[in-house]
């Protein structure tokens, strides 16, 4: 038995300079696990609640001392003495202790920090790398990265309404090479922007955040130019992905693309996306419709779902109840997995498993407010998810995940596999 003998929560800062929760869990053997939780900017309304202090005199009200206090007192009292290797029982204990549907009493940030730290301690106790602890001997598949090279929406202060324009190196032979493809395109894009006199400042997730004359299509065309200049073939070696984060520009039943001067119905917005899919090698569209516009989601899925990965993020918020409803109604064909949307590892793994059983893909994801914690890299490999979304090729909070994946691929050696296009098994 790996009994938990001490838990310490603390307030640290994330990549945006906002407070977040970190937790240390100490086991009887002397082994310790540490984990820190991320935070999002564009959030789904049905996400588990992130507990903030609301004290405007500290960190503009964004302090997390309440959540830390729950870890150091109430949660600590409930889990001391529990076996760290019994993750499902520990997570159930946390859920029952909170007692709310959306984790609003203790806070998903407090609960997740404990859940992750316990898993790290248990893996260390077992003498296993975290990905192997999660997935056993079957954990051999590296994820295809979705790399956010141009930021817009809530992640940048520019004229782009869409939140992320991504490159997806699905033609690479290995994860290491996929990362190289991405880095070389990133640097090619930087030079293109510089030569055009466009800002090369980066946004929250490390992608460039320029005002782009000509809007979204001009931005897509610059990415395609960068792919070509880096020596790769768009569509064959590197595909494109979009995160629309459409809830952020959905107003009164219309999709208000202010940067384009457009106000569109769900049908018109779908037509516009379909036009882009026809013109450009776009293989994935995330949150193409607002989270509450299920009719719009159905239109989008029916129109593009056979050829394009249609990912639900704000739509599903890593919640199995909502995901099941989407599966039953034929909404989307993929789920974005964000551990802090649901608040425990056990519930996270349940959402991944449900998606796979239904033929949906599961894309493991970071948040825009990140830390040096690299747990999601281990989750991506441990669950054989096949895809990961963890930002651009800059900012150490993003690179921490990529570098951990490099280490995992090295550790796996010859048994490591890189799925490439087959990671998109939801497409026909």
Swiss-Prot record:
Q: Which cysteines are joined by disulfide bonds?
A: none
Instruction: Supply one GO BP term.
Output: glycolytic process
**Which cofactor(s) are needed, names only?**
Mg(2+)
Its main subcellular localisation, reduced to a broad class, is cytoplasm
Binding site residues for Mg(2+): 243, 286, 313
Q: Name one GO molecular function term.
A: magnesium ion binding
Among HAMAP family, the record links this protein to:
Enolase (MF_00318)
Protein name per Swiss-Prot or TrEMBL:
Enolase
């Amino acid at each position: 038995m790996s009994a938990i003998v001490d838990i310490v929560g603390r307030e640290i800062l994330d990549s945006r300079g906002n407070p977040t929760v970190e937790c240390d869990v100490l086991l009887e053997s002397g082994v310790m696990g540490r984990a820190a939780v991320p935070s999002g900017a564009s959030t789904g309304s049905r996400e588990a609640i992130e507990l903030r202090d609301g004290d405007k005199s500290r960190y503009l009200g964004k302090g997390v001392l309440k959540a830390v206090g729950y870890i150091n007192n109430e949660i600590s009292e409930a889990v001391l003495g529990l076996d760290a290797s019994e993750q499902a029982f520990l997570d159930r204990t946390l859920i029952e202790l909170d007692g709310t549907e959306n984790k609003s009493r203790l806070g998903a940030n407090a609960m997740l920090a404990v859940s992750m730290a316990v898993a790290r301690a248990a893996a260390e106790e077992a003498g296993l790398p975290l990905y192997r602890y999660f997935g056993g001997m079957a954990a051999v598949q590296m994820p295809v990265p979705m790399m956010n090279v141009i930021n817009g929406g809530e992640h940048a202060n520019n004229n782009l309404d869409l939140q992320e324009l991504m490159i997806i190196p699905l033609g690479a032979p290995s994860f290491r090479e996929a990362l190289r493809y991405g880095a070389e395109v990133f640097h090619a894009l930087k030079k293109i922007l510089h030569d055009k006199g466009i800002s090369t400042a980066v946004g929250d997730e490390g992608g460039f955040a320029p005002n782009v004359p000509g809007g979204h299509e001009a931005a897509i065309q610059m990415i395609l130019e960068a792919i070509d200049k880096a020596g790769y073939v768009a569509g064959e070696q590197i595909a494109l992905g979009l995160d629309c984060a459409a809830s952020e520009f959905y107003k009164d039943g219309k999709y208000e693309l202010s940067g384009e001067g457009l106000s569109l119905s769900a049908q018109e917005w779908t037509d516009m996306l379909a036009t882009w899919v026809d013109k450009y090698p776009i293989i994935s569209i995330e949150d193409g419709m607002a989270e509450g516009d299920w009719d719009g989601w159905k239109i989008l899925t029916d129109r593009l779902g056979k050829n394009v990965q249609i990912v639900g993020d704000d739509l599903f918020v890593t919640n199995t109840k909502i995901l099941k409803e989407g599966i039953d109604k034929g909404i989307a064909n993929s789920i974005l997995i964000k551990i802090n949307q649901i608040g425990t590892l056990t519930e996270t793994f349940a959402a991944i498993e449900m998606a796979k059983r239904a033929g949906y893909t599961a894309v493991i994801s970071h948040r825009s407010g990140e830390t040096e914690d690299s747990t999601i890299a281990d989750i991506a490999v441990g669950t054989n998810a096949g895809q990961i979304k963890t930002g651009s090729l800059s900012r150490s909070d993003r690179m921490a995940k990529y570098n951990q994946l490099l280490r995992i691929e090295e550790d796996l050696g010859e048994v490591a596999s890189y799925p490439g296009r087959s990671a998109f098994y939801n497409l026909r």
